[in-house]
């Protein structure tokens, strides 16, 4: 899939996949996400996602209903136990920065986790297959969402480093990530529902048949 390519399928021949970078990312055009998709279109998008890892659908004025319908083509949707959701749509998280909001000591702890490299909801026993972001308002500057190819990062590690991390386990802890935002009672309920998830640092991506890094705090270290 080097350069611009069209998906060869009777029902998906209008879909155009245009890579945006050498390692990951592609724009998908020739499709309207405000309308139901055919199985062939869904299969084409899934194949593009496995290959390119990050997909961009530009100028899609989708509603909340469209957002949920599109997500369900790829599996069951998950809510979030802490982050606010859209009224009537528990599957959609509501992420907003108020106009003119200043970074103060009070808001910094809330903004800090999202302003560093992370993968969402890894505290679940089974990590999410993907997330679907919809931008409604873009800041005049900044506000970029940046993606990294963790499979490429792992592939480029020196052999001695790969050997060192071969058996390392990472601890994915919902309380470490969100405990400061909830009451002690709520934290106890979260811990009961989401026990500490221990996962191998070197994780497998089954669909792409590749190894990648799924990092977090390493067990036995500060």
Residue ranges, per PLM feature:
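Non-heme Fe(II) oxygenase catalytic core, chiefly the N-lobe of the double-stranded beta-helix
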Residues: 2-222
């Amino acid at each position: 899939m080097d350069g611009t390519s069209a998906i060869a399928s009777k029902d998906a021949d209008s879909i155009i996949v245009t890579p945006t970078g050498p390692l990951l990312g592609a724009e998908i055009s020739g499709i309207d996400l405000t309308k139901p998709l055919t199985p062939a279109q869904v299969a084409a998008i899934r194949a593009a996602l496995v290959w390119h890892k990050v997909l961009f659908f530009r100028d899609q004025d989708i509603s909340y209903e469209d957002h949920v319908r599109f997500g369900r083509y790829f599996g069951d949707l998950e809510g979030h136990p802490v982050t606010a959701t859209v009224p009537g749509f528990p599957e959609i998280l509501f992420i907003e920065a108020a106009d003119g909001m200043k970074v103060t000591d009070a808001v910094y702890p809330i903004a800090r986790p999202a302003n560093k490299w992370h993968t969402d909801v890894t505290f679940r026993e089974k990590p999410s297959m993907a997330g679907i972001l919809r931008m409604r308002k873009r800041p005049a500057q900044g506000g970029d969402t940046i993606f990294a190819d963790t499979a490429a990062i792992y592939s480029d590690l020196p052999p001695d480093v790969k050997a060192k991390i071969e058996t390392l386990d990472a601890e994915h802890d919902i309380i470490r990530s969100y405990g400061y935002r909830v009451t002690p009672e709520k934290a106890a309920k979260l811990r009961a529902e989401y026990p500490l998830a221990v996962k191998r640092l070197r994780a497998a991506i089954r669909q792409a048949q590749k190894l990648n890094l799924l990092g977090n705090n390493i067990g036995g270290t500060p």
